[in-house]
Amino acid sequence: MGLYHSIYGTEKFQGFTLSVERRAEIRTLIGERAERLSYLNCAVLRASIERNLDSDKGPFAIDDRICGEVVELSREDFDDLLRVHLCDWLEQVPRSQEWTYRRDAYRRMAEWLGGVALESFEQVYAGH
Protein backbone atom coordinates (compact mmCIF):
# COMPACT_ATOMS: atom_id res chain seq x y z
CA MET A 1 0.00 0.00 0.00
CA GLY A 2 2.71 2.42 1.05
CA LEU A 3 2.25 5.72 -0.72
CA TYR A 4 -1.30 4.90 -1.79
CA HIS A 5 -2.95 4.83 1.64
CA SER A 6 -4.58 8.26 1.09
CA ILE A 7 -4.53 8.41 -2.72
CA TYR A 8 -8.24 9.31 -2.97
CA GLY A 9 -8.13 11.81 -0.10
CA THR A 10 -9.43 11.18 3.40
CA GLU A 11 -11.99 12.78 5.66
CA LYS A 12 -9.22 15.07 6.96
CA PHE A 13 -6.76 15.19 4.03
CA GLN A 14 -7.80 16.59 0.67
CA GLY A 15 -4.39 17.59 -0.70
CA PHE A 16 -3.12 15.71 -3.73
CA THR A 17 -5.71 13.09 -4.62
CA LEU A 18 -6.82 10.95 -7.52
CA SER A 19 -10.42 10.52 -8.51
CA VAL A 20 -12.04 7.25 -7.44
CA GLU A 21 -12.85 6.77 -11.12
CA ARG A 22 -9.19 5.72 -11.41
CA ARG A 23 -9.48 2.84 -8.95
CA ALA A 24 -8.93 0.25 -11.69
CA GLU A 25 -5.61 1.87 -12.59
CA ILE A 26 -4.50 1.84 -8.98
CA ARG A 27 -5.57 -1.82 -8.61
CA THR A 28 -3.34 -2.68 -11.57
CA LEU A 29 -0.40 -0.93 -9.90
CA ILE A 30 -0.68 -2.19 -6.33
CA GLY A 31 -3.05 -5.16 -6.43
CA GLU A 32 -6.68 -5.65 -5.52
CA ARG A 33 -6.34 -6.06 -1.74
CA ALA A 34 -3.97 -3.12 -1.30
CA GLU A 35 -6.20 -0.88 -3.41
CA ARG A 36 -9.30 -1.94 -1.45
CA LEU A 37 -7.60 -1.09 1.85
CA SER A 38 -6.40 2.22 0.42
CA TYR A 39 -9.93 3.02 -0.72
CA LEU A 40 -11.40 2.06 2.67
CA ASN A 41 -8.86 4.23 4.50
CA CYS A 42 -9.80 7.14 2.26
CA ALA A 43 -13.54 6.56 2.34
CA VAL A 44 -14.10 5.83 6.02
CA LEU A 45 -15.94 8.32 8.17
CA ARG A 46 -13.60 8.09 11.13
CA ALA A 47 -16.29 8.07 13.80
CA SER A 48 -17.78 4.94 12.24
CA ILE A 49 -14.66 2.96 13.15
CA GLU A 50 -15.29 3.34 16.87
CA ARG A 51 -18.64 1.58 17.00
CA ASN A 52 -16.87 -1.60 15.89
CA LEU A 53 -14.48 -1.57 18.83
CA ASP A 54 -17.13 -2.61 21.35
CA SER A 55 -17.11 -6.30 20.36
CA ASP A 56 -14.48 -8.41 18.66
CA LYS A 57 -17.21 -10.73 17.36
CA GLY A 58 -18.46 -8.39 14.63
CA PRO A 59 -20.18 -7.76 12.39
CA PHE A 60 -17.80 -5.01 11.33
CA ALA A 61 -19.00 -2.10 9.20
CA ILE A 62 -17.90 1.42 8.36
CA ASP A 63 -19.61 4.41 6.80
CA ASP A 64 -18.24 5.21 3.34
CA ARG A 65 -18.15 9.01 2.97
CA ILE A 66 -17.58 8.76 -0.80
CA CYS A 67 -20.52 6.61 -1.84
CA GLY A 68 -22.69 7.22 1.22
CA GLU A 69 -23.14 3.52 2.00
CA VAL A 70 -22.34 1.21 4.88
CA VAL A 71 -19.54 -1.21 3.98
CA GLU A 72 -19.32 -4.55 5.78
CA LEU A 73 -15.83 -5.84 6.54
CA SER A 74 -14.34 -9.15 7.56
CA ARG A 75 -12.36 -9.16 10.81
CA GLU A 76 -9.16 -9.37 8.74
CA ASP A 77 -10.10 -6.34 6.64
CA PHE A 78 -11.23 -4.39 9.70
CA ASP A 79 -7.96 -5.10 11.51
CA ASP A 80 -5.92 -4.17 8.44
CA LEU A 81 -7.91 -0.95 8.01
CA LEU A 82 -7.17 -0.10 11.65
CA ARG A 83 -3.46 -0.74 11.09
CA VAL A 84 -3.33 1.56 8.08
CA HIS A 85 -5.48 4.24 9.69
CA LEU A 86 -3.61 4.21 13.00
CA CYS A 87 -0.15 4.16 11.40
CA ASP A 88 -1.14 7.03 9.13
CA TRP A 89 -2.24 9.13 12.09
CA LEU A 90 0.74 8.23 14.28
CA GLU A 91 3.03 9.39 11.49
CA GLN A 92 1.14 12.70 11.12
CA VAL A 93 0.41 13.76 14.68
CA PRO A 94 3.93 14.94 15.63
CA ARG A 95 3.91 17.34 12.65
CA SER A 96 0.30 18.46 13.01
CA GLN A 97 0.56 18.83 16.81
CA GLU A 98 -3.12 17.81 17.06
CA TRP A 99 -2.50 15.75 20.17
CA THR A 100 -6.11 15.83 21.36
CA TYR A 101 -7.75 15.05 18.00
CA ARG A 102 -9.62 11.75 18.51
CA ARG A 103 -6.91 10.67 20.94
CA ASP A 104 -9.18 8.29 22.87
CA ALA A 105 -10.36 6.69 19.63
CA TYR A 106 -6.81 6.17 18.43
CA ARG A 107 -5.86 4.67 21.79
CA ARG A 108 -8.77 2.22 21.50
CA MET A 109 -7.58 1.25 18.01
CA ALA A 110 -4.07 0.68 19.34
CA GLU A 111 -5.38 -1.39 22.24
CA TRP A 112 -7.53 -3.43 19.84
CA LEU A 113 -4.49 -4.25 17.71
CA GLY A 114 -2.09 -4.59 20.65
CA GLY A 115 1.61 -5.33 20.31
CA VAL A 116 3.56 -2.96 18.09
CA ALA A 117 0.48 -0.80 17.47
CA LEU A 118 0.01 -0.08 21.17
CA GLU A 119 3.74 0.40 21.72
CA SER A 120 3.85 2.86 18.81
CA PHE A 121 0.86 4.79 20.14
CA GLU A 122 2.43 5.08 23.58
CA GLN A 123 5.78 6.13 22.11
CA VAL A 124 4.28 8.81 19.84
CA TYR A 125 2.01 10.22 22.56
CA ALA A 126 4.56 10.04 25.40
CA GLY A 127 4.72 13.40 27.12
CA HIS A 128 1.70 14.83 25.33
Where are the model-predicted features located?
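Divalent metal-dependent catalytic cores for phosphoryl transfer on phosphate-bearing substrates
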Residues: 1-109
